[in-house]
């Protein structure tokens, strides 16, 4: 999927690029697989902001995605490749031979008319989902489960891919896009191939308004605030932050500070930390 550049007819279009959406084959989503999606503006039930920089944006409906791929042994035909406003990857509409319809994350190279299936005996080809114990070492995979039957949680965004490195005992060793090598149960399922829409990383937003369409509000730097609003605030004119290291608005160290809990239970599954 290439990206389209614009002539610099305005400051907003000078560096803006957009996807050409060449892989998209259907504009209207499948109604039976939609759910309402209410905007919160980053507020909780008390009306207080719990997530900053959220608000506004175009109205969306949630697409119900099959991350579990638990319809084993039943073949499905790819009916369409669709856009999903809730994620960077595209989604594929599957029509199963028994009449059921489901969405999955569309892997790179999947086309309308292709046949996909899940289960132990599925072929090793993009879009098929198998337990890790049935996938050959060296295979590129995505949509990986952390617990058997829970549904894929890892490697789901556009262009991402992991690799099955080894199998040892009851666990598979997987190299994730971050460079981390992690052990996952061989009973967990994964989907073959790389997530589609691989040119997503080349899209340049170009202007602030486009971020507002996405529901993302401006991020104000702490150093330009008043002392009452941020630990970096205050001072006459341009001032340094006045601390050994930057902190969040609540005084916690940030920008390079390690936030992972020490002695976390899942540490024993991580063979090599991310880069």
From Swiss-Prot:
Gene3D superfamilies tied to this protein: 2.30.30.30, Nucleic acid-binding proteins, Ribosomal protein L2, domain 3
Pfam annotation, one family: Ribosomal_L2
InterPro entries to which the protein is assigned, alphabetical: NA-bd_OB-fold, Rib_uL2_dom2, Ribosomal_uL2, Ribosomal_uL2_bac/org-type, Ribosomal_uL2_C, Ribosomal_uL2_CS, Ribosomal_uL2_dom3, Ribosomal_uL2_RNA-bd_dom
Keywords: Ribonucleoprotein, Ribosomal protein, RNA-binding, rRNA-binding
SUPFAM superfamilies assigned to the protein according to its UniProt record, in alphabetical order: Nucleic acid-binding proteins, Translation proteins SH3-like domain
GO molecular function list: rRNA binding; structural constituent of ribosome; transferase activity
Entry's Gene Ontology cellular component terms: large ribosomal subunit
Composition bias type Basic and acidic residues, residue spans: 264-275
Membrane spanning residue stretches: none
GO terms classed as biological process: cytoplasmic translation
Residue numbers spanned by region Disordered: 224-275
Known role: One of the primary rRNA binding proteins. Required for association of the 30S and 50S subunits to form the 70S ribosome, for tRNA binding and peptide bond formation. It has been suggested to have peptidyltransferase activity; this is somewhat controversial. Makes several contacts with the 16S rRNA in the 70S ribosome.
Annotated family: Belongs to the universal ribosomal protein uL2 family.
Oligomeric and partner information: Part of the 50S ribosomal subunit. Forms a bridge to the 30S subunit in the 70S ribosome.
Protein name (database record): Large ribosomal subunit protein uL2
